[in-house]
Amino acid sequence: MEPLLWHVDATTPSHIQALQSGSLPPASPAAALTRVQRALSFFRTAARKYCKQADAPDLFALAMTRVAEHNDIAVDARNVEQLFHFVGQHVANTAERKALRAALREQRALFKASLPGACFPAPAPPGWGIPKPPPLPPPFVWKGCRYNVVAPPPRIPQPPPLPKFAPFVRNNFRVVAPPPLGEVYQPVGAPFPQTRASAALSFFRTASTCRQVLVESCIQQPAFMTCCASTGEVQEMTSMLTEARQTGKILTPKEVSQALAQKRKEIKGAEENRISFDEGVHLTEADVFHRLSLAKRFMAHKRDRTLVDVLMPTEHEVVRYPGTRPDGTLQMCVSALPRMSEEAARKLLEKGWKNSKNVSLDIGVTSYMPYGAPIVAFMTIMDGRTDDPQEAALCANYMDLGREKSKVLSLPLVTIPLSEIEHDQGILDCLYIVTYFHGVQSYQPGTLMMSYGTLEFQEYSNNSFTTATRVRESWDQILKRNENLGKRVHAGIGVLGTIEKEMDQQLEDFPAINLETRPRPVVRTFQNAHQPLHKTRSMRIGTTSFTGNTGRTVLPPVVKTYEEGNANFDSLQSKPRHSSASTAHLMCAVTVVPDPTCCGTLSFKVPKDAKKGKHLGTFDIRQAIMEYGGLHSQEWCAKGIVNPTFTVRMHAPRNAFAGLSIACTFDDYKRIDLPALGNECPPSEMFELPTKVFMLKDADVHEWQFNYGELTGHGLCNWANVVTQPTLYFFVASTNQVTMAADWQCIVTMHVDMGPVIDRFELVPTMTWPIQLGDTFAIDRYYEAKEIKLDGSTSMLSISYNFGGPVKHSKKHAISYSRAVMSRNLGWSGTISGSVKSVSSLFCTASFVIFPWEHEAPPTLRQVLWGPHQIMHGDGQFEIAIKTRLHSAATTEEGFGRLGILPLSGPIAPDAHVGSYEFIVHIDTWRPDSQVHPPMFSSAELYNWFTLTNLKPDANTGVVNFDIPGYIHDFASKDATVTLASNPLSWLVAATGWHYGEVDLCISWPRSKQAQAQEGSVSITTNYRDWGAYWQGQARIYDLRRTEAEIPIFLGSYAGATPSGALGKQNYVRISIVNAKDIVALRVCLRPKSIKFWGRSATLF
């Protein structure tokens, strides 16, 4: 503020009386002092029109200087008032004031909360500033036991009288020392410490006077400028001369400079990193700093006093795996490295400490990777005040995450000025950590890799001149390394031997990376900000090989320098230029990296007003791989059958306002018939099959990774067949709440990992009969989007607990794999877990509570909060235990329990928003408890397949024949009326793709005549191929009077397992009935012995 005042005063014409006195000559020092007083009074009075702060002149000077520099103008007396009022209008705005100085918020709050009686300036002109304060209250009287104290009334501070200078004459120059400041009384109810305001104003007055006198002296005596020294140098030289006089030797100025240079202390090994492999090595304050006795502390000169402290600014900061970029390069992860809190820095500043030096930084890392895993982390400490990586990178190190603990220590990193925290808010958090991971094979992005904590040793000084320090001189005194590497098992009781996983796996070379700085935030200015360039500078770090002392076994490299040459390189064979593949690819750009995992693409248009159930696109996996070609199709053709892992990546632009979600359904057995569904994809029907729902608000690239064998139970053949056709269906899962500007394009890429070679078609069965569940069962079921209206209604939403048996949807009945499995028992109990994803627009938000409920009537909030519940705020996970009157819910019936959803608060949306708050519930896992539930049928496990009535025998022979093949399907015949039965066995066959095993075919029939009058027989034979070929096995003939028969049959085909349909020539059972007109009905039942099922699917009927 003071230089700006003098610049304005120097440009003020002599005839202007607003800033100078007319009674004194303009050239006299008294007149200069009067001008300074008037200038300060003008700025104080004008500044308080906009801001009630003690340091308002400094605030306005900073703002005016920045505005003048931005507009390329000079501040003088002609434009100072206009510029001041322009800046004041911006400072009056809370946002602009916050951008200038965040520290003023605390003072502003104190001012508003201050008591009446604070000193106020002269009345402001009409229309400026805040309302005038209320009149002063009567004096406050506090009565004690024996005395009365009356607080004096507040008084407005008056400018001090003109200082009287005591001249001190020297040979070549003159120094004027101002008188000491007087005591300033702080009135009751002052909004801020009066000592700070008085000290600031006194400093400006004194500094302005001294500056004026100094300028006049420099003009009169030019030699004075060559003799001016800083205050610290004068004091240091004075003390050295005094010490020399006492010892009897007078030093020359050159000898004094040499003596001062010898007093500097430098730490050996600064800017180095030291890695300690011992978990027991911990630095203490005594290891880093010299201890001083109390006598030395108090006898030391004030300028040489230091304060040391040990802080732990970071206790537990986690670092997750960021994944790799689409081109395969490593991606960085930025994490915080704070120094101290702003409150702690202000307390140190109030005590007089100006600078904070980072003496030593101890970073401890805890790895969450398996022991011995060859994963390396590259950690770099960066300076956030620069965008140049070469300047920002302070120190870096490679960490072996195969060891649980790692530690890194480094000597001085940076010194920060505590006195500038108000002007530069980025000082306290100027350091951050950039981490790269290498060696990760299959961990998903977001996996927790490690965590770190920091221990910081700081030294504070009260000035910038002193060279005193308490830091020890070398690394050897700070750190004593103690390596403790060895076996996993060191000792034990009764241990004869140990088997341990290899810990010394060779570390792979860390690839080259582009070290970048963190993005810069947007800084608000007084003028319109220009659009920044979307470019960042980077620093290339080459490939690093770990062949030194890493604690792991190092494999000797095999280098072949010349082909077919001896030690003398006699037979050196040259190759033509650009003849090798490695040099041929160098002609391409280094940033263009082909993706070796991509095996197919799909593009489709999304309507701007996409409606729920809209079919967007179909992706045939087998056809896409063959058409895409490349290494994957060649490898697939060579292996014939593989068990791949697919990754579906949908590239859709992130948009949190559309309120749109797109789903992807996997169908391997041609169960989805789009024409039968009206060329639409109803979400309730599609969700019965394996599905993944993508919300456009979550990311720009949405991924779904699944293993083909886990979903289908078998390998993927490269030849097309009539049974399997792996297909992905993309459709709109929820209607977008905000209509887009136009139809937009979406790209889907399919990526594959072929996996190891397999030698069989069937893999691990998905389910075996009899059904046996483990500790958990994967339901994996999405439910159609629920919505909470904006009309303020609090009606309860629910999801029924009938998780078994067929269910009726909007267009079709459906039976899924999870419904078929859970329908074997009459009831179920336990805990269900899942997630909730909001598919609503960002304009609409709400919170709700999830709870178990049984009744139709909605509960009260007290009933909900008394029981198990979970409050959801947007997206989140939940786990709810079932709660019914009998602790269980019926598997195939409604009304015995439901998952209740009750709006809690909201929804909140703008006035123009017309949609509701929508969310999708996904039930992932069921965890049964110890409750026992009986099966649906008796322990005999006999299930009816079909019943034949109205038999139509041949008119001539009176015989009727029925062929029952070796696979379970919907039996049909033209010679009788067929009634198909429905039971858990038939549901499981319909919900899977393949089955195989042995069953007993149980046949029974009622007759219409009495036993003694009954004539006829039933012939049952096992056959293969056509009947005329007579490939027959067992053949039995039963009298019609017996009414029942049993015969075993194998379910399968030439491929092993069989689908629910004909697959080549299969074995079958022929039933021939003589005199069939006397049979009322023929029932065919199945008694399973051992059946295996493959594939998670569903059937729509």
Curated annotation (Swiss-Prot):
Question: Which biological process annotations from GO are given for this protein?
Answer: transport of virus in host, cell to cell
Is Transcription among this UniProt entry's keywords? no
Q: Which SUPFAM superfamilies does its entry note? A: Positive stranded ssRNA viruses
How does the record describe the protein's post-translational processing? Specific enzymatic cleavages in vivo by the P1 encoded 3C-like protease yield mature proteins.
GO CC field: host cell plasmodesma; viral capsid
Q: Record keywords: Transport included?
A: yes
Q: Which cysteines are joined by disulfide bonds?
A: none
Among the Pfam families in the record, one is: Nepo_coat_N
| A GO molecular function held by the record | structural molecule activity
Sorted keywords for this record are: Capsid protein, Host cell junction, Transport, Viral movement protein, Virion
Question: What is the similarity comment for this entry?
Answer: Belongs to the nepoviruses RNA2 polyprotein family.
Q: Note on file?
A: Virions are comprised of 60 copies of the coat protein.
Descriptive protein name: RNA2 polyprotein
This chain's source organism reads: Tobacco ringspot virus (TobRV)
